């Protein structure tokens, strides 16, 4: 494991200062549970393929979100209610892009589509079957990369 992680420190510190992310005791068991849930969500989304595009997409989105959150939980960080899902994305991306932006950046397009699907309106379409497939394809590498990162990234410290 790396002793001290510098990349993205200014962004994560700013998220903490703004109370969008908070420090918690690091919890590897909970991080592993989040990854287990992420894999289950992804598998369930695939089982539903072709039957419920919005539900399929939301499961793929939740799989991706829990993969990203597992990284933070393992570091002793979590989003606050005011930070929400976007704070998770910002904290992970700040620390891991580069080199892993290609793996984690798809969460950026998934989040607003999830919101549009959860709170639909006539001018914002909900997720389609194609979106669900793309969401599954994006979530799978996020889960696998997060699983590998848990052994590499240290507890977040000052």
PLM region descriptions:
Residues 1-158:
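Terminal alpha-helical segments
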């Amino acid at each position: 494991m790396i002793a001290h992680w510098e990349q993205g420190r200014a962004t994560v510190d700013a998220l903490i200062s703004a109370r969008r992310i908070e420090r918690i005791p690091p919890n590897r068991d909970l991080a592993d549970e989040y990854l287990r849930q992420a894999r289950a969500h992804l598998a369930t989304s695939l089982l539903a393929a072709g039957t419920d595009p919005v539900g399929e997409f939301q499961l793929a989105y939740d799989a991706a979100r829990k993969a990203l959150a597992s990284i933070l939980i393992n570091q002793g960080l979590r989003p606050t209610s005011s930070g929400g899902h976007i704070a998770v994305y910002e904290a992970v991306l700040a620390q891991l892009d580069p080199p892993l932006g290609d793996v984690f950046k798809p969460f950026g397009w998934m989040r607003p589509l999830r919101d549009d699907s959860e709170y639909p309106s006539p001018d914002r379409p909900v997720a389609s079957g194609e979106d669900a497939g793309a969401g599954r394809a994006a979530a799978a590498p996020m889960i696998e990369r997060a699983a590998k990162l848990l052994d590499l990234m240290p507890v977040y410290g000052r």
